[in-house]
Regions:
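Extended, low-polarity transmembrane helix blocks
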Residues: 1-114, 121-379
């Protein structure tokens, strides 16, 4: 049984250093993360992704989804602005799905529930993760019309680049890499610039070295353990935020006050009133809002490249994602009866979590009870 915080049970001398406050193994412990030093694991991200798919599947069972109008309206909106050949394919798919809406919707809803359940069960998680990538990309292209990127007025505030694309990016980011020994998902080190090198240990703590003590692996994230590696995952984050910032250059994106106000359409009266109030705050300030908003998005994207600014950039990204998800999208319009997902806000925040650098303590906790000498984590 895991007992609380192992730092309170094991004297620092057990790790080869003086028993001094704030130190482990003679080295100063890094500052705890913004969620209180709790573990951020690949499996935790995978489970969260599974919960999101379950939510999407549940939303797909809403009565309005089983009607012809749902497919005609949704795919008709997705078709706006698409290039000619793609638009033709989208139109043909709309006709096919609208012919038997109840059957197709039941299949889609069941598939999303199955993906979510599969991600929650370890034995099927890898297969479900792979299938979720294919389905998410299909939804992004067909159901969201490539995230609405060809339609004027699409930006971060209204849901760009599309929740489905972010589902796929997260799934690819946490896809387990194969260690040199052949074990899928085994811990690997990127220390010293050699991906796949075995993780060093000292004093029973993974990532410790004979000279540096605990913390040699600190700063690594869930993405670092994935098949893409942390560096490529961070560039993907940069591309997402640069892309949304570029969308602010469109003239149709220069009316944020109106976009915030119209978010309330179809919402209950109280929610719509809040949307109108938020939109009213920025009336007459559209251009300054767009400039500052675009600058913040660029800063969030660039900030992850430097270790020193990575945490602040990711924290700012989470704040922006949740703010736009709530004020700009009403969490995908969950209360309208027509929502298919909770919007891009929660998913973009989850992407940030996969990139969040762990502390040395988080690395030791991630390694499990065996990492602590004398079995201090177990009783």
């Amino acid at each position: 049984m895991v007992i609380g915080d192992w730092r309170k049970q094991v004297p620092a001398s057990r790790f080869g250093g003086a028993d001094r406050p704030g130190r482990i193994g003679g080295a100063r412990e890094p500052t705890a993360s913004w969620w209180g030093g709790r573990r951020v694991t690949r499996r935790g991200v995978e489970i969260t992704l599974g919960v999101l798919w379950l939510v999407d599947g549940a939303l797909q069972f809403q009565p309005s989804m089983f009607t012809r109008g749902f497919f005609v309206d949704m795919l008709g909106m997705a078709n706006m602005g698409l290039p000619g050949p793609v638009s033709t394919v989208e139109y043909d798919l709309t006709s096919m799905l609208a012919a038997h809406p109840a059957l197709w919707n039941a299949l889609f809803a069941a598939l999303q529930v199955a993906l979510g359940a599969g991600l929650l069960w370890r034995r099927t998680a890898r297969a479900a993760l792979g299938l979720s990538i294919l389905w998410a990309l299909s939804v992004w292209i067909v159901g969201e019309g490539v995230g609405g990127l060809f339609m004027g007025g699409t930006n971060l505030l209204t849901g760009a680049p599309g929740a489905a694309l972010l589902y796929a990016l997260i799934a690819v980011t946490i896809w387990p890499r194969r260690a040199s020994g052949g074990a899928l998902g085994a811990p690997v080190s990127t220390g010293g610039g050699v991906p796949g090198a075995p993780v060093s240990t000292h004093g029973g703590v993974p990532g410790a070295s004979a000279s540096g003590g605990v913390g040699a692996r600190a700063g690594r994230s869930v993405a670092d353990e994935g098949v893409l590696g942390g560096a490529l995952a961070r560039w993907m984050w940069l591309l997402v935020w640069f892309g949304t910032a570029a969308l602010e250059l469109e003239p149709a994106s220069h009316t944020p006050a109106a976009q915030l106000t119209t978010t309330g359409e179809g919402e209950p009266g109280a929610v719509a009133a809040v949307n109108h109030a938020i939109g009213g705050l920025f009336t007459g300030w559209d251009l300054p809002f767009v400039v500052v908003f675009a600058f913040l998005q660029v800063a969030v994207g660039v900030g992850v490249l430097a270790p020193r600014t990575r945490r602040p950039a990711l924290a700012a990204g989470v704040a922006l994602a949740l703010a736009t998800g709530l004020a700009g999208q009403d969490l995908g319009g969950l209360l309208t009866g027509n929502a298919t997902d909770p919007g891009t806000g929660p998913v973009l925040a989850l992407f940030a979590v996969t990139l969040w650098p762990r502390t040395a303590v988080g690395e030791a906790l991630e390694a499990g009870p065996a990492a602590v000498p004398g079995g201090a984590l177990a009783r």
